């Protein structure tokens, strides 16, 4: 994996406390971006964002000089790159396995990430839920 794909970018994630946006922030940081974000309050996912500054409550506007990646829930409040577009950018940055469908995506994606890690791989993953086996 190219760990510097996003080097030099300053990405501010509005809605960083959600399962998807917190995973995007972690992935962006792993790919070399400076990351920071905002959410209305702490969540179980903000605890996973070690080394990422989080602004809680108040105004979700980013500091000057930061690109905004915005969750769907906050798109009406602030302009920025929609999360789906940023996900497409992440997927294009490195080889990816994408799981889609109506049911079982979190379980299936979690099983794939777990299997890759347990067999000696160094996967990154973005999963829309909590997978205890992945830590």
Q: What are the language-model segments listed below?
A:
Residues 27-30, 62-64, 72, 76-135:
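Phosphate-binding loop of NTP-binding sites
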Residues 1-86:
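N-terminal leader/targeting and accessory segments in enzymes
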């Amino acid at each position: 994996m190219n760990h510097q794909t996003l080097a030099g970018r300053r990405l501010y994630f509005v809605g960083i406390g959600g399962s998807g946006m917190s995973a995007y922030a972690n992935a962006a940081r792993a790919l070399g971006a400076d990351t920071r974000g905002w959410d209305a309050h702490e969540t179980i996912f903000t605890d996973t964002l070690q080394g990422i500054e989080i602004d809680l409550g108040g105004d979700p506007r980013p500091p000057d000089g930061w690109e905004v990646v915005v969750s769907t829930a906050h798109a009406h409040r602030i302009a920025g790159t929609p999360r789906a577009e940023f996900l497409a950018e992440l997927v294009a940055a490195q080889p990816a396995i994408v799981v889609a469908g109506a049911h079982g995506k979190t379980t299936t994606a979690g099983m794939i990430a777990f299997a890759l890690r347990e067999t000696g791989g160094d996967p990154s993953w973005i999963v829309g839920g909590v997978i205890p086996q992945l830590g």
